[in-house]
Structures are given as C-alpha cells and as structure tokens.
C-alpha cells in the first residue's frame, strides 16, 4: 500500500524494541528503545505479563511517531491502574498480596497464572469459582484437557462451589467436578471447599507471608478478596 510500517516488540529487528523487563510487585518495569534510538523507561502498574508490556510499548511507540512528549507519556503510563477485575490489586495484609481476576476460560486462567508466577512472590494460590452449571458440565467434557492443564503453574488451587447465575442446579455438577478434572491431570495441591463460609478460613491457612492469592472467576468470588484482606490484617 506504500504506507510506512513500524514494528514493536522483543525481537532485535523491531523498530521499537523492548530491551529489558523487571517484575516489581504486581507490575512490570520495562525499558524501550524507540525508532529514533531514544531509550525510555516505564512501568505497567498492576497488570503482569509480557503482553501488557507489549501493549505499553505500542502506546509509547505511537506517541513518539506522533511527535508528542514520550517522557510524559511514560510517566503517565505508570499511573494507569488497568481494567477492573483484570489482575485487580485488592490489597496486602500480613505479608500476603491479594488480587482479583475475571478469568474463567482455560486460556485466560493459564495466562493469568503464568503472569503471576513471573512476579516476585514465593507461591501463587488460586481461589477459583466455576461459573454456571451448564458451562461446568460442557467445559469439563469437551474442554477437559484444556481445563485440566490450565491450573498447572499454580502452587495451590482451591475450588469453590458453582456460581449459578440464576441457573437451576444440574445433578452431579459441583465445584468438585472441576477438582476431579484438575487432580486427574496430576495437580498435587488442589482442593474443593463446598461451603462459602469456610473459604476465607481455608485461604488463611494456605497463604503465608510473601505469597500471592488470586480470587478468580466470573461470579461473586470477587467479594471474597476484600474479606480475605480484612482477615489477613487482623
């Protein structure tokens, strides 16, 4: 088409190249060499994963091509808190960091856990709430292998019971259905906690200073995260 194309990424032949990354808390600091040779540093505040670094690099590259203030953009990027329920930092108490994430599809689950494991935490604990009885029945059937491996990198996995979202229960379908899929796949530290009232006490027993807890799912598991932070701080 005759239009100029500018590439960005980690490869040496990119016009804008990400030179280095460093995990910082629940975020990632990175340095970027711009197409004109300048090097800028910035930080993704609370969304881990190289894909988020790549997104940040794209923004700074575009800013530079438009002739705008890249240094100011790099500074402001560090203040961006990200999207709600996407590695949403809820708080830290008792040396334990708690984040909340909407992931409920196996690809999202695996990507979120992988990004978390790249951060500077001792262990990563996932509290997962399955969403809808119909989805659990379907996903653990036709996507059994994908869900079985999605939690592989988590140090521990705790399954809550199913968030119904208004659906009637399906006989034989509970949070334990997910547990069976994951343990059959070989995860050594996965459990099912059927009663909601027991979830926070269980996570208090599991998490230790230096650990990260991710409350995960599309249901009301998000309400557990602040409760857990409160209890950790007592």
What are the language-model segments listed below?
Residues 17, 136-137, 168-169, 202, ...:
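Short glycine-/acidic-enriched loop or helix-start segments at secondary-structure transitions
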Residues 6, 19, 125, 156-158, ...:
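Hydrophobic/aromatic beta-strand patches that form the interior of the parallel beta-sheet core
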Residues 198-229:
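A glycine-rich beta-strand to alpha-helix segment
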Residues 83, 115-185, 195:
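Active-site beta-alpha connecting loops in nucleotide-dependent enzymes
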Residues 4-8, 174-183, 227-234:
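A short, gly/pro- and small-residue-rich
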Residues 3-110:
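Adenine nucleotide phosphate-binding catalytic loops in nucleotide-utilizing enzymes
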